[in-house]
Regions:
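Hydrophobic alpha-helical membrane segments
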Residues: 1-335
């Protein structure tokens, strides 16, 4: 029997355990990276098609549109498509189809990821305690085809309902953002760029918190084998009793994401300088592709490390509720 509370109070050990469990199940990292890349690639198809459609309507060259600033590209596409209702409907239908199909794929992949990480954390033992042995990593590796199928079969329908709720929440946030940016200002002091800046910061914060709660709901649904609504009180209890630890893990994961982004930007800039060197610049393209692959895998690894860490915190909270029998009655002792 593993002592789940031995390292519960240590952020360092919790993150270390999450990283080791994720590394042991490296197959899940690659699966999620491939699925995320496929989703983004499919999403680019209707967008590129929209650019070509706009270029054909205005009689220009699609490559000339790509040389514009992103804001100019978006404004040009919106202006042209609004003037062509049929083209706008076709573009929105294609974009919506890809979004729906890609989202369903990502829900299935996340069901696999959470199932594997739950099993890995359950059987890993005190893997975060030194010395680290290869046998411990092999024991924590729970990635196999049978578990993948089991995860999709048992969690997909619930994750799909949860994802629909997430989509509705995103739509409400987007509507509120558009109302704040394009609607009449509440006060004269909030007019102009200040309103856009505050609304953008508020949207980023709201999306981060929504994604955080969404991830916790996914974990609790899988760990407790319950429905979406039944998972809500479990998440509320987890946040109430482990708010500090959860906040520290979230801050650590976001910091790692920012560091990885900074390193990626520096690497891209350095490779961009190499591209101007004759002959040597030929090596820039494969290096850029390699850097992109490494960046994508690192991002998925960091994200899944957060999932594994939250799984651990949830299990320690569940283990802190110990049934005790006294005078023939069952009492519950909470940590």
């Amino acid at each position: 029997m593993v002592d789940l509370s031995s390292t519960a109070g240590s952020l360092k050990f919790a993150l270390k355990r999450g990283a080791l469990v994720t590394a042991a199940n490296w197959q899940v990292v690659l699966v999620q990276f491939v699925a995320d890349t496929l989703f983004k690639t499919l999403l680019a198809v209707p967008i590129v098609g929209g650019l070509v459609l706009v270029a054909l309507v205005v009689g220009g060259n699609p490559f000339e549109l790509l040389r514009l600033e992103p804001s100019q590209i978006i404004s040009t596409m919106v202006g042209v498509l609004l003037a062509q209702p049929f083209a706008l409907a076709a573009f929105l239908a294609a974009l919506g189809l890809v979004l729906c199909g890609g989202s369903v794929l990502m829900f299935a992949v996340k069901a696999v990821s959470v199932t594997v990480l739950l099993a890995g954390d359950r059987i890993a033992g005190p893997i975060e305690q030194p010395p680290l042995r290869l046998s411990s990593l092999k024991q924590a590796n729970q990635s196999n085809v049978e578990r993948f199928i089991t995860g999709v079969r048992s969690l997909f329908s619930r994750y799909l309902r949860l994802g629909i709720g997430l989509t509705v929440t995103y739509a409400l946030l987007a509507g509120a953002y558009m109302a704040l940016v394009f609607g009449p200002p509440a006060t004269a002091a909030l007019a102009g760029p200040l309103a856009v800046t505050l609304a953008s910061l508020g949207l980023i914060l709201a999306v981060t918190l929504v994604n955080f709660v969404y991830l916790l709901l996914q974990i609790v649904i899988a760990a407790e084998d319950c429905g979406v609504l039944e998972a809500v009180p479990h998440v509320a209890r987890l946040l109430r009793r482990r708010l500090k630890s959860m906040g520290q893990v979230l801050a650590a994961i976001l910091a790692l994401m920012l560091m990885a982004t900074g390193v990626s930007i520096l690497a891209t800039a350095a490779l961009g300088l190499i591209a101007f060197v004759p002959f040597v610049g030929l090596a820039a393209l494969p290096l850029q592709v390699f850097a992109w692959l490494v960046r994508g895998v690192v991002f998925q690894f960091v994200g899944l490390t957060g999932v594994a860490t939250y799984v651990r915190l949830h299990r320690t909270l569940q283990a802190s509720t110990v049934p005790v029998r006294s005078d023939g009655l069952q009492q519950v002792t909470r940590a």
